[in-house]
């Protein structure tokens, strides 16, 4: 059974620390990390300094930058780390610092949310879950192992609560992302479609996991990024680079305004095409991480999924509705899949839903 927190859940300790960070005149207050969230907080809170052990810069927005060992032990620290939030929290706890993170600050602060930088891929989740509980339950019941169900529950509890306590146990494990040894079988002469290849950062893992690969299609809308990938992997004749976005239909030479009118996601591409149009051979594996355009790309791969029954590794962290609409789309096209869920990062990013063909055992 899906074991979720009550929707009125509050982390009382974090709430109290956020209030102290906002309103205390006696507590020393520091922000750990320098990014857009740091600047957002500084507009509303008078702080005593910024912590960054790795910068040579001595100040930011007229505030001194300190090493962690220079900070008073009774200080309250707000971490803005997005890449390793659990590692940072555990390190601060070990050193004895009271600490909170930006998600707690965003949730419990009484500052108008429109005045704060919005954390990505999470603020739409609570309302969507409330309105579509039945759909989430359906997906939970489709998951094929207990590990998937545990991950499903933990990540949803986190997204509802903004509380990193629910993410304890997750680590940054990018090498296994898309290639989970528990799920993905060995495939000889694989044809691999890398949707959202960026600068080719997944290519080394494809080659490592499938050294006798037949073909890799790298599809990336950003011209600069795909040119970097081409340069880095130019020695491979069987890697093809395609400079376009993926969607549910072919659209050419779109202006920025047309993009806004046609796309309900952040996948900005002047030219969009479908997987069915682009690939004219059997595809064994499709990976998609394309900034919220995954639903459209799957619709545009209808024939490929129906006829090839490729393994699918699809990122579902960009939009709340991806959690249930992506499995709906895939199973409507081809019901002969087992569904699994894995999460490969300490924080918000890198939740992957796997669709493994029933006949893959």
Question: Where do the language-model regions lie?
Answer:
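Phosphate/nucleotide-binding beta-alpha loop and adjacent structural elements of enzyme active sites
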Residues: 1-47, 53-75, 79-361
